[in-house]
Amino acid sequence: MAEKFNRKLILEDGEEYLGYSFGASSDKVLEIVFNTSIVGYQEIISDPSYTYQAVVMTYPLIGNYGICEEDFETAIPSIGALIVHEYNDEPSNFRSMESLSETMKRFGIAGIYGVDTRQLTRSIRELGSRKVLITGIETTHSQGLEILKNTQIPKDSVSKVSRAQNRFYPAQNRKYNVVAIDCGMKQNIVRSLVARGCSVTVVPWDTDAEKIAQLSPDGIFISNGPGNPEDVPKTIETITKLRGKYPIFGICLGHQLISLSYGAKTYKLKFGHRGGNHPVRNLKTNKIEITSQNHSYAVDKESIKGTDLEITHINLLDNTVEGVECKKDKIFSVQYHPESAPGPQDSAYLFDEFIKLMEEGKSNA
């Protein structure tokens, strides 16, 4: 006899999907999104940008290679849940230290498998991201809808995932001192900077400009992170004060915050960009780069007109803004993840562009 379903998803518009539990069995109300990556589920569950989200993996088989300690993107994953079609609880990988389900239990990440992820993804594409309840099979449909109606997703995601104190990452052959504002920073960003001779001081999201200046940076990095960029006005204020004084490089949420600091606007996409194969055109070189992306919001193209920003990159799937710069202020940013993890490395050169700006600053000092 087939195993009985023991978990379910109830979406706020009434859709319902049945499945089986893996990972933690806690009930949660989250925002449902999907990711099209084939591999990289460990980096996905440990990416702070997925805070308060339930991620549907479109690739049908997840868990094959287990979990490797050194591949985490943050020490304490904050993703809400993982939704998959088929889960493999017997990984084959000499580097694996435990199964995906064991890791998810350890960090309280809910999981459900056996779900028709093709239909669910199609629903998200057609109707957009929305609230979902992950719960036990005993929860009735009407009970689930009532819970969804009365539960709001918190807006404190950046403060939740940002570190509370400064942390220093030394480079073996230090050439530059970078201060990174942590809005939910992935570890591979730190690795990418350190590998290029940057000693990195990671500071909390709400660190003011004066304290950052006291660290004598050669350049400032604004990290990725979760949620609505308009929910972190403190960081926008800090960027505004630092503009023109130091070279600044921003990624993902950092890109949105930089744009807002110049007076541009942001808006929420219908279902966001999440995956490792998004084509982007570099307008300066006319080359196409395949990029890794994970974001719900985008910078409004029309709102950039009249600011000091210039659009540098465009998404070829929906023509949204993927990069901006202000040459006179030595500041630039991209909506995607050049550090990959997971994903292609077509855009890793952007870290080298940041290095060039810092080198120019040192030469002109």
Question: Predicted regions: what is each one?
Answer:
Residues 287-329, 365:
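Catalytic beta-strand/loop cores that center a nucleophilic Ser/Cys/Thr
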Residues 110, 177, 247-249, 265, ...:
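Proline-centered loop/turn at the N-terminus of a beta-strand
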Residues 116, 252, 295, 337:
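Active-site glycine-centered loops adjacent to acidic/histidine catalytic or metal-binding residues
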Residues 218-290, 296-301, 343-361:
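Cysteine-nucleophile active-site neighborhood
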Residues 323-365:
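A glycine-centered loop/beta-turn motif at secondary-structure junctions
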Residues 175-179, 199, 247, 290, ...:
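Residues that mark the start of a beta-strand
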Residues 2-210, 214-215, 229, 341, ...:
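RNA-binding accessory domains that recognize and position tRNA/RNA substrates
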